[in-house]
Regions:
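Small-residue-rich, membrane-active alpha-helical segments
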Residues: 31, 75-76, 278, 297
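All-alpha helical catalytic cores of prenyl diphosphate-utilizing isoprenoid enzymes
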Residues: 60
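Alpha-helical architecture feature
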Residues: 4-53, 64-72, 85-268
Length: 297
């Protein structure tokens, strides 16, 4: 609500300053996190986003643009709470490696999340002899989030193709500059093999490949993001660095000058107000005075 955002404004401004972003960007993240996952501790939300942005190539400006739609898709996919938020932040960082651009990564993630609980995906899994809804529900009851459970189910479908397994092994040791091409080749194989039968959307498929084949990195992103939210203050650390820059000190000086000027005007304003009221009264009582004053100006 507007009242909640108003209460969070100091934290929003602090997070924006610490990350070199705008208050509007962080307000969008705060609103989306609250609306979709019920996350009402904005300090924690901001710390997790800041940490994720520091660890990977999907930065705060990208989150402000992509998270509102992604968080809605994450909610529909069954991701919940701060652990679900951490999974989403980590997934974005992994997705950059296969997409090449942050916009592409964001779209791949949205499409993947939308596919997890879609009717057409459930129908495709049924053709493979797998009850998608039932399997995801059982996994959640055991404490496995839906993204992890979905990945395990897709693995069952694609594990039979030796070409995919060979490329998967190659991707683990390949330098980052070669990974995008490898993932593209994997996608071509996957589309013709089992995985293409349950993930027919190309962008969703690329999002999945990023998640599955960058799984170790995804896990590191997620655990680091969660840990710093519980024990650290990434926003505070950034703020410490920002506060030492010349531009920040200049902004503080200008703000202090403006504040001092405002305080001085607050003291003078009552006197100016009384003077204005007196002049207005004279002009009202003696109209010729106004003409004389105007002629003398």
């Amino acid at each position: 609500s507007p009242a909640e955002i108003a209460r969070a404004l100091p934290q929003i401004q602090r997070a924006a300053t610490a990350n070199g972003g705008s208050s509007e960007e962080f307000a969008k993240i705060a609103l989306a996190a609250k609306r979709n996952l019920g996350l009402d501790d904005f300090s924690r939300v901001a710390n997790m986003a800041t940490t994720a942005g520091q660890l990977g190539g999907f930065e705060i400006k990208d989150m402000a643009k992509g998270l509102p739609e992604q968080l809605a898709a994450a909610k529909n996919a069954g991701l919940t709470g701060y652990s679900g938020y951490a999974s989403l932040l980590a997934l974005n960082q992994a997705a950059v490696s296969t997409a090449g651009t942050t916009d592409g990564a964001s779209n791949n993630v949205v499409n993947l999340l939308n596919k997890i609980n879609s009717r057409d995906t459930a129908a495709d899994f049924k053709k493979q002899g797998i009850d998608l809804d039932g399997s995801l529900l059982k996994a959640q009851e055991k404490g496995t989030n839906t993204l992890e459970a979905f990945g395990n189910l897709v693995d069952r479908v694609v594990a039979k193709d030796p070409r995919y397994a060979a490329l998967k092994a190659k991707a683990k040791s390949a330098p980052e500059s070669e990974q995008k091409e490898i993932y593209s080749n994997m996608a071509q194989i996957a589309e013709g093999a089992g995985i293409g039968k349950v993930l027919q959307d190309r962008q969703a498929l690329m999002g999945f490949l990023a998640y599955r084949n960058q799984h170790e990195k995804y896990g590191q992103f997620g655990s680091s993001t969660t840990a710093i939210a519980n024990t650290g203050d990434s926003v505070g650390g950034n703020m410490e660095l920002v506060s030492q820059t010349a531009s920040f000190k200049s902004e503080v000086l200008n703000a202090n000058r403006a504040l001092a000027m405002q305080e001085a005007l607050d003291k003078v304003n009552p006197l100016l107000g009384s003077m204005a009221e007196g002049i207005t009264g004279l002009i009202r009582d003696y109209p010729t005075l106004a003409a004389a004053m105007e002629g003398g100006v």
